[in-house]
């Protein structure tokens, strides 16, 4: 059966129809047993990781911070230094239980293991809400080369809406994981805010830093010719903070701000990866850095990841915080409506750090 399916893909349109329009995703494509990567997934040579300086050695990677350290001042400094110098760090002993993390991974596999007809209920064409979306790649309509990834994206409005609209197969685990990370998020934002002279994370500041939450369940199936494509292309996130749960397979690479080399982020059991998003870079007037990152495709293993994007409310107007520029520091960014920024990000393909040019003065 698989060989028959694999043999039927004679044209680009047939592949696109099977993956995108019929809702099979790249998981379905991978499971047909294809041996050669379809043309529309072949990235330009300059976008393949083999064309970049890559550091796989353990002597250079993002900082690892023990959040449970009783010396809160030293933890805060480590977080802020990492936000300025790397834009990425891993946290351990962060207060989210291993059981919750493992349940989230299991639920992710469970959702993507559903029959295609079940997953398609949450596609762009069939979903009851734009807050719930099953899809593939990033922006297929805008991309010259597709990315080797399927996803379920869930924008959180309320537990009541989630109970009605989110898939049964992963709802409870996703809500629990999201709720369990909130104390960690607030602690990190408090550290980052205090370093910007924000004395208190009051309701106004909360609406800027963490007024909205989106969680994605990502699935990267085994890929033929993984060296020719990407799981996710070069980009920075548009969030304030991103909290990433990755499995043991690995594949996330971050571009070092100091050397420009791509550095592998090795999976650490029980850890969470934190990265600064564009919104935080804008609000900090460039002190904290959102950094290019990307995900490799894998020829041997299926991989999952679950990022939580903590962001301003869509209707918020964001710009450099008054606390940052009140002493005469010149603003680098203009005030922008956050929803306009997000729309700008999603209407194009991944293109490194170019999105933030939208906010430049």
Swiss-Prot record:
Binding-site positions, 2-oxoglutarate: 220, 303, 305
Stretches assigned to the Fe2OG dioxygenase domain: 211-312
Inducing factors: Not induced by 2,4-D treatment.
Family matches, as PROSITE patterns: FE2OG_OXY
Tissue: Low expression in roots.
Residues given in the record as Fe cation binding sites: 235, 237, 293
Domain of life: Eukaryota
Single annotated GO MF: dioxygenase activity
Essential cofactor(s): L-ascorbate; Fe(2+)
Keyword terms, alphabetized: Dioxygenase, Iron, Metal-binding, Oxidoreductase
Record note on disruption phenotype: No effect on scopoletin and scopolin levels in the roots.
Cofactor binding mode and count: Binds 1 Fe(2+) ion per subunit.
SUPFAM superfamilies (alphabetical): Clavaminate synthase-like
Function statement: 2-oxoglutarate (OG)- and Fe(II)-dependent dioxygenase (2OGD)involved in scopoletin biosynthesis. Converts feruloyl CoA into 6'-hydroxyferuloyl CoA but has no activity with ferulic acid, feruloylquinic acid, caffeic acid, caffeoyl CoA, p-coumaric acid, cinnamic acid, cinnamoyl CoA or benzoyl CoA.
Protein's recorded name: Feruloyl CoA ortho-hydroxylase 2
Protein source organism: Arabidopsis thaliana (Mouse-ear cress)
Gene name of the record: F6'H2
């Amino acid at each position: 059966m698989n060989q028959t399916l694999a043999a039927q893909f004679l044209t680009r349109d047939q592949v696109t129809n099977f993956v995108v329009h019929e809702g099979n995703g790249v998981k379905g494509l991978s499971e047909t047993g294809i041996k050669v990567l379809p043309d529309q997934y072949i990235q330009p040579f300059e976008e393949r990781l083999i064309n970049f300086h890559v550091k796989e050695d353990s002597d250079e990677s993002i900082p690892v911070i023990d959040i449970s350290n009783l010396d809160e001042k030293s933890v805060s400094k480590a977080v802020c230094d990492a936000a300025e110098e790397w834009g990425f760090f891993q946290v351990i002993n962060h207060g989210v239980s291993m059981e919750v993390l493992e349940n989230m991974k299991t639920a992710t596999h469970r959702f993507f293991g559903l029959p295609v007809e079940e997953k398609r209920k949450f596609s762009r064409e069939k979903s009851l809400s734009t807050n719930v979306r099953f899809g593939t790649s990033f922006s297929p309509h805008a991309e010259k080369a597709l990315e080797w990834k399927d996803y379920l994206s869930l924008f959180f409005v309320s537990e009541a809406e989630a109970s009605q609209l989110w898939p049964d197969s992963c709802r409870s685990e996703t809500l629990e994981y999201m709720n369990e990370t909130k104390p960690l998020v607030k602690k990190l934002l408090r550290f980052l805010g205090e370093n910007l002279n924000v004395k208190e994370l009051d309701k106004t500041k909360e609406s800027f830093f963490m007024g909205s939450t989106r969680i994605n369940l990502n699935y990267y199936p085994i890929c033929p010719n993984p060296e020719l494509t990407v799981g996710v292309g070069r980009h920075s996130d548009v969030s304030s903070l991103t909290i990433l749960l990755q499995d043991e397979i690995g594949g996330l690479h971050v571009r070092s701000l100091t050397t420009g080399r791509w550095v592998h982020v090795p999976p650490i059991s029980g850890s969470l990866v934190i990265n600064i998003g564009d919104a935080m870079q804008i609000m900090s007037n460039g002190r904290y850095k959102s950094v290019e990152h990307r995900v490799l495709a894998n020829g041997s293993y299926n991989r999952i990841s679950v990022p939580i994007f903590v962001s301003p409310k869509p209707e918020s107007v964001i710009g450099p915080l008054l606390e940052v520029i009140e002493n005469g520091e010149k603003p680098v960014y203009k005030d922008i409506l956050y929803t306009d920024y997000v729309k700008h990000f999603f209407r194009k393909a991944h293109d490194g750090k170019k999105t933030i040019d939208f906010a430049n003065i």
